[in-house]
């Protein structure tokens, strides 16, 4: 029996695939569990339309990410932090703080998990932070840590 997979089934097929499976497997497992439905012209065209819409959505998201990476590349972000002796920070500057400061200064929301630090930031100075949007797309920002003025 030919079925169109509605969900991924390990070892059998992925969402959108149209494959031949045993009749009993299709009738007793795939169709009752709504993992697949019998393949017909209308079902395959519906799946193709959903796949095309998903591809357009992914392409749009990819273009937006590329634009954001281009806008943020080379941006200077400054953070004021409390310091102790020898310009050593109390605690450290985390990716959460950096992401919040990027959003505050540029208006662009960045997920903290996309930020990559080469080392923990525990002293004043200038650091390069990589924002990895996906495996092929990244940008670098310059992070400047300055001492908070005591009043």
Swiss-Prot record:
Q: Which GO terms describe its molecular function?
A: rRNA binding; structural constituent of ribosome
* Alphabetic keyword roster: Ribonucleoprotein, Ribosomal protein, RNA-binding, rRNA-binding
Does the keyword Heme belong to this entry?
no
Matching PROSITE patterns: RIBOSOMAL_L9
What Pfam families is this protein classified in? Ribosomal_L9_C (PF03948), Ribosomal_L9_N (PF01281)
What are the annotated GO cellular component locations?
ribonucleoprotein complex; ribosome
Q: Which GO terms describe its biological process?
A: translation
- The highest taxon in the source lineage is Bacteria
User: What NCBIfam families would the database entry show?
Assistant: L9
The UniProt entry's sequence similarity note says: Belongs to the bacterial ribosomal protein bL9 family.
Record's function text: Binds to the 23S rRNA.
Which protein are we looking at? Large ribosomal subunit protein bL9
- Species this protein is from: Dehalococcoides mccartyi (strain ATCC BAA-2266 / KCTC 15142 / 195) (Dehalococcoides ethenogenes (strain 195))
